[in-house]
UniProtKB/Swiss-Prot annotation:
PANTHER family given in the database record: TRANSLATION INITIATION FACTOR IF-3, TRANSLATION INITIATION FACTOR IF-3, MITOCHONDRIAL
Assembly information from the UniProt record: Monomer.
Record flagged with keyword Iron-sulfur: no
Protein name as it appears in the record: Translation initiation factor IF-3
This protein's record includes keyword Protein biosynthesis: yes
Organism: Geobacillus stearothermophilus (Bacillus stearothermophilus)
Annotated localization: Cytoplasm
GO biological process: ribosome disassembly
GO cellular component term, pick one: membrane
């Protein structure tokens, strides 16, 4: 669990602002008085806002509260989607069929919700014709325009030119 709460005897403050299990404020009480009220109700005294003046404590069933918190965190983790970046490597002199195969792979990755990094590696003197690589990447981004947006425009990195495509949000 990401946040552990201070409970019962572990609370250091002399007086606390007390809230009962229904959310009603019982006012400012001494720590001892608050512990007695919690004990009478067979519940725990939990410090929920330690930085307030005076600190805020709530009377609740700590075991049940912790279980609920863990359940909420688990649900939040389930809803988080891990975004992977898949790479598609191209060359500036790519043939039509090879381009279509790479395009099909890129579209498949985008439809699954992954980002796609399209990389063109320039070999030898091909680096002098960057505009050819630029055209290949532009063609790829135009072919995926219906399901993706360009996150990073084509740019050079050493002998490589790359472009990052992200899936459009209205897909999911």
């Amino acid at each position: 669990m990401s946040k552990d709460f201070i409970i019962n005897e572990q609370i250091r403050a002399r007086e606390v602002r007390l809230i009962d299990q229904n959310g009603d404020q019982l006012g400012i009480k001494s720590k001892q008085e608050a512990l007695e009220i919690a004990a009478r109700r067979n519940l725990d005294l939990v410090l929920v806002a330690p930085n307030a003046k005076p600190p805020v404590c709530r009377i609740m069933d700590y075991g049940k509260f912790r279980f609920e918190q863990q359940k909420k965190e688990k649900e939040a983790r389930k809803k988080q989607k891990v975004i992977n970046v898949k790479e598609v490597r191209l060359s500036p002199t790519i043939e039509e069929h090879d381009f279509n195969t790479k395009l099909r792979n890129a579209r498949k990755f985008l439809e699954k919700g992954d980002k796609v990094k399209a990389t063109i590696r320039f070999k030898g003197r091909a680096i002098t014709h960057k505009e050819i690589g630029q055209r290949v990447l532009d063609r790829l981004s135009e072919a995926c325009a219906d399901i993706a947006v360009v996150e990073t425009a084509p740019k050079m990195d050493g002998r490589n030119m790359f472009l990052v495509l992200a899936p459009k949000n209205d897909n999911k």
